[in-house]
A protein has these predicted regions:
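Signal peptide-directed extracytoplasmic domains
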Residues: 19, 23-173
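Bacterial extracytoplasmic/cell-wall-associated proteins, especially those involved in peptidoglycan
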Residues: 43, 119-128, 133, 138-338
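N-terminal hydrophobic or amphipathic segments with adjacent small-residue motifs
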Residues: 9-12, 35, 287
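N-terminal start-of-chain detector that recognizes signal peptides
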Residues: 6-10, 54-55, 78-80, 256-261, ...
Length: 338
């Protein structure tokens, strides 16, 4: 009888042990993906209780024992984790040990001012801490930035500034010869104007060519976005540019100042920066909208005047009143020489 009991006990222990280890790979109970945030310095017991409470494992104790038996307890890392539906204990353990937290993202569009970017960072609910002062205009690189929950706002802004520095350092030495600017900062200033002049990627380099040619010939840039920045620091003007604003003496108004304005008017993207560092060859000095969403370029004032007339004719077919939200488009003026 004792032998039978011993045999049964042994079979029971073996069965329990088999169940214990086989259960490691069984599908879990979660019907859908769950997000679990493990705070730093959380005990292993609390972690498994949290996972059971979230419904990702059936019971806390078996999972805790599994982790301890396999020597994985000390390797569990704090973080924010996405646990797939029906993930096994083995799969969940691999996620917790990997430390690969959920990657959140913040996309900074080309052409935003530093204050606009700063406000985006301040409003992001995943980031923590104070954003600090508004970064200097034009020092941030538009990009999609990935970060984990708990990253500080100040650190992300610093990362954006470092990204621009790295990009400029990588491309400044390969710039075209004979450009009418001598520092990376001046390149950023011109690139910011190019960025605000067009949303069309295939026009950026051509517009950069026009502005580079104008600077080389001592012609004023006469860029409408510089007027707007001087008045609103990049926010919408709310009306078409008026003659008084066109003639207004702000430091950024390139209709009245020679050369580049004192600083960028936005944060230019990589394409705009590359466009001013390596503009395509050509002699164009003017551009005007074609009324169909693109621009017409010209090397002579006569050709430019024909393009302006064509634009105005197109606008008359659309509406009896020519819109004046862009002086460059609606009432182009002849560039003035120094």
């Amino acid at each position: 009888m004792k032998k039978v009991l011993a045999l049964l006990l042994g079979l029971g222990i073996a069965g329990a042990a088999g169940w214990f280890f086989l259960a490691w790979d069984w599908p879990g109970p979660a019907p859908a993906e769950k997000t679990v945030l493990i705070a730093p310095r959380t005990s292993l017991h609390a972690v498994t209780e949290q996972l059971a409470g979230a419904g990702t494992v059936a019971f806390a104790l078996p999972f805790e024992l599994q982790l301890r038996a396999r020597g994985l307890g000390p390797q569990v890392k704090a973080g924010e984790y996405a646990i797939p539906a029906h993930a096994s204990m083995a799969a969940i353990a691999a996620i917790l040990v990997s430390g690969k937290s959920i990657q959140h993202r913040l996309t900074v569009a080309e052409g935003l001012t530093s204050e606009m970017v700063w406000k985006l960072v301040k409003a992001d609910p995943v980031l923590v801490g104070d954003a600090g002062p508004v970064p200097q205009e034009g020092t941030l690189l538009p990009e999609t930035y990935l970060f984990t929950r708990g990253m500080t706002r100040a650190r992300l802004l610093a990362q954006m500034a470092a990204a621009q520095t790295t990009f400029l350092d990588a491309h400044w030495a390969a710039r075209a010869p004979g450009l009418p600017f001598t520092t990376p900062r001046q390149a950023v200033i011109l690139a910011s104007i190019v960025e605000k002049e067009t949303a069309l990627p295939d026009e950026r380099r051509h517009i950069a060519q026009v502005f580079v040619n104008r600077l080389k010939q001592g012609m004023r840039l006469q860029s409408d976005p510089t007027i707007i920045y001087g008045l609103t620091r990049g926010y919408p003007l709310g009306h078409g540019i008026r003659q008084s604003e066109l003639d207004g003496a702000t430091p950024y108004n390139t209709y009245v100042i020679d050369g580049l304005p004192p600083g960028p008017i936005a944060n230019p993207g990589k394409d705009a920066l590359l466009a001013v560092l390596n503009p395509p060859p050509g002699d164009d000095l003017y551009f005007v909208a074609d009324g169909k969403g693109k621009s017409l370029f010209a090397a002579s004032i006569a050709e430019h005047s024909r393009n302006v007339s064509a634009f105005r004719a197109t606008e008359r077919l659309k509406t009896p009143q020519v819109p004046t939200d862009s002086v460059r488009q609606a009432v182009p003026r002849l560039p003035r020489r120094k």
